[in-house]
Amino acid sequence: MNLKNVALFAGFFFATLAIFVQGILPMLEPESRQLKITKVVRTDLGELKWMEHEATDYSESELIGRQVYIREGCWYCHSQYVRPVTGERRRWGPVTQAGEYAFDMPHLFSTRRIGPDLSRVGLKYSDEWHLAHFWDPRMVVPDSIMPRFAELFDGPHQGVKVVEDDEGNRTLDKTADTGNIFDYSSQEKIMLTPNAEGLVFVSEKGKYPVIWTPNDEFTGDTVNVIAQTEELEGLVDYIQKLGTNRGKWRDLFEPQSIDASMVSIPRSEEWIAFGKEVYTRRCEGCHGDNGNGNGPAATFMYEFRPRNFTAGVFKFRLTPSGSLPQDGDLWRTVTRGIRGSSMPSWHMLPDKDRIAVIQYIKYELAVDRSDPAEPY
């Protein structure tokens, strides 16, 4: 047997071995067919406990999203496996169990983490955050190296004129493109708030468009329109499914467990200066460079707009109405986020970053400067 035949045989053997080990053997393992997982549930007494349950299958929309995830190569950079080694549990959440992958064929463990692990990302961020992230990751993570996935959107349809309708509403000019997105005869309206650059995201087609800018978020006369698609919606649904088979594990996640009542931070110019850097890197994409709640990503956040810090109004606080929150209130919000809104948890930031950004928000953005003698 000559060397050429040996090489050919070896190549065929190892290719077959790889298919068997990575494709066939996992299906033969009993663990690959078990649905049992442990998840955190809240009992009738309000207690959080780990209990044994069965994993649930993907919905039709989630399966569409999973195919998009595979097609677009998301698994090249993102793993879906929390390893049983030091630091993984604290960084990502509970260690992976076999039952979580019972409906995954093929599995998407991946082997590299160029981007973060996604096995516990479900419900960490809002749907709107993910939409902004897919359109342009730098909107919400300025130092991200993730590519844009603008092709998943319908659009952009550029230079659409803002006009006034018969009822005095600011709406969008009817063109061939906008006619495919909106129903100009519909009685059901969709409120659209462009960002400062004039980008408008349409979350639901078939409604009558109304430009809604209560705080003069946008004063231009043309906008660029992008809209939701079935593949984009499915991809977001799939991402939000990841990790949810483990129940309310976030409520027991140690890094988010805090005693905010003990937090008190003296005012410091040094902290404020550093806080501005943190704000620019982590918060500006949603809340805007001046804290008015209209950052580049804000147009995607159609259900819960980012907080306008300049108004000095904070919903989650222990202080009386009309007053600023305590440092502990802001610490809790920054650390744990606000479930159901576009505000994610920032527990992974160093303490000094969270302290500094609270100082910057409190003493630079959320202050009434109408009296120069008492600017704070």
Question: Which functions belong to the PLM regions below?
Answer:
Residues N294-A298:
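Conserved catalytic-core motifs of eukaryotic protein kinase domains, centered on the activation segment
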Residues G65, R71-Q80, H130, L235, ...:
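The canonical Cys-X-X-Cys-His
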Residues K39-I70, P84-V85, I114-P116, N224, ...:
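Electrostatic cytochrome c docking/interface patches
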Residues L8-G23:
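Hydrophobic membrane-insertion alpha-helices, especially the h-region
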Residues A55, E62, G87-V236, T299-L349, ...:
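Extracytoplasmic electron-transfer domains, predominantly the class I c-type cytochrome c fold
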Residues R83-P84, N292-G293:
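Short, non-ligating residues that shape and space the ligands of small metal-coordination modules
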Residues M1-L8:
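N-terminal positive-inside, membrane-proximal cytosolic segments immediately preceding the first
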